A protein has these predicted regions:
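Structural motif
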Residues: 28-29, 147
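Internal catalytic domains of large membrane-associated glycosyltransferases
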Residues: 131-134, 145, 151-153
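A short beta-strand-turn-helix
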Residues: 11-28, 53
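N-terminal targeting signals for export/organelle localization
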Residues: 1-10
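Structural alpha/beta surface segment adjacent to cysteine/selenocysteine redox centers
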Residues: 31, 36, 42-124, 136-143, ...
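Non-catalytic, surface beta->alpha helical segment in thiol-disulfide oxidoreductase systems
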Residues: 150-168
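Generic recognition of flexible, low-complexity loop/linker segments
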Residues: 17-20, 133-138
């Protein structure tokens, strides 16, 4: 953890944006700034499950760095994932949608839309959340994806997400 304390720290809180997986009382919070159309984010997604299942004291927060004026694919996938989090009892689980996108339909929007169908009102209702995340990323000067923070500190570039267990 000492190496993390020497890294850049997030200036503002992220508690009310994005999607969180894991217990709310977790000792460690891993914040991942991502984009559904980022290849490196796709690769990183494979490690998220391993991390969540390996320790009960970790929660993972996903924040999308996607402008609402972005490409159709980025926006539609972000809306669907956020829409599932907004109404989990009615629709699909957010982790199910993330898994399907990154593991089975990456960059294939038509396949994704055949599998996950949401009312237009649910999808459009996510635009404020998408804008809020995008503006937060800009205010923190986070322009690249993925970016990973552990308890608010930037994970050094020379480490991979799977190595987080050794850092905490």
């Amino acid at each position: 953890m000492k190496i993390l304390m020497q890294q850049r720290k997030i200036e503002s809180l992220t508690d009310n944006i994005g999607i969180v997986f894991g217990p709310s009382t977790a000792e460690y919070k891993i914040t991942i700034i991502t984009n559904p159309c980022c290849y490196w984010c796709k690769e990183l997604h494979k490690e998220i499950h391993n991390l969540l299942w390996s320790r009960s004291n970790i929660k993972i927060q996903i924040i999308f760095n996607v402008p609402s004026s972005s490409s159709n694919m980025e926006l539609e996938v972000s809306r669907a994932i956020l829409g599932s989090a907004a109404s989990p009892s009615t629709y699909y689980a957010s982790n199910e949608i993330l898994d399907f996108w990154f593991e089975k339909s990456y960059n294939n929007l038509s396949l994704f839309k055949k599998r996950f169908i949401f009312p237009k009102t649910i999808l459009e209702a996510q635009d404020n959340k998408i804008n809020e995340m995008y503006f937060w990323c800009n205010s923190e000067k986070l322009y690249t994806t993925p970016s990973i923070f552990i308890n608010g500190f930037l994970m050094p570039d020379e480490y991979e997400l799977k190595e987080v267990l050794y850092m905490i």
